Amino acid sequence: MASQSQGIQQLLQAEKRAKDKLEEAKKRKNKRLRQAKEEATADIDQYRLKREGDFRRIQTSVMGSQGNLAVKIEEQTVEKIQLYSSSFHKYKEGVLQQLLDLAYNIKPELHTNFQYKL
């Protein structure tokens, strides 16, 4: 019986060693998974920062060019207003005189299609 007891003890010890090895393997696996997850998260964060930087750089270049366009449009608008203003002052007297001549110098005439009937 002692040999059976000794055999059972050996089996129990072997079972315990196997259980310990399994637990240690699970711990190593969990540790590797955690480490892989942390590395993936770090890579994702790094990629996100890179893409956000690219986006900001492109956005700045586009918005900057739009700002330049706004300045150019403003300059062109001012130039056009000055041109129209100078044209107005240049031709104002002549146009006013033509309008007054048309209003005051009336020449009554019969229409060419008018037929006088008696």
From Swiss-Prot:
Gene: atp6v1g3
Biased composition (Basic and acidic residues): 14-26
Disulfide bonds: none
Domain of life the protein comes from: Eukaryota
Subunit structure: V-ATPase is a heteromultimeric enzyme made up of two complexes: the ATP-hydrolytic V1 complex and the proton translocation V0 complex. The V1 complex consists of three catalytic AB heterodimers that form a heterohexamer, three peripheral stalks each consisting of EG heterodimers, one central rotor including subunits D and F, and the regulatory subunits C and H. The proton translocation complex V0 consists of the proton transport subunit a, a ring of proteolipid subunits c9c'', rotary subunit d, subunits e and f, and two accessory subunits.
Bias (Polar residues) ranges: 1-12
Protein's UniProt keywords contain Ion transport: yes
Record-linked Pfam families: V-ATPase_G
Organism: Xenopus tropicalis
Keyword annotations of the record: Coiled coil, Hydrogen ion transport, Ion transport, Transport
GO cellular component assignments: vacuolar proton-transporting V-type ATPase complex
Region span, Disordered: 1-37
Name of this chain's protein: V-type proton ATPase subunit G 3
MF terms in GO: proton-transporting ATPase activity, rotational mechanism
InterPro entries: V-ATPase_G
Family membership: Belongs to the V-ATPase G subunit family.
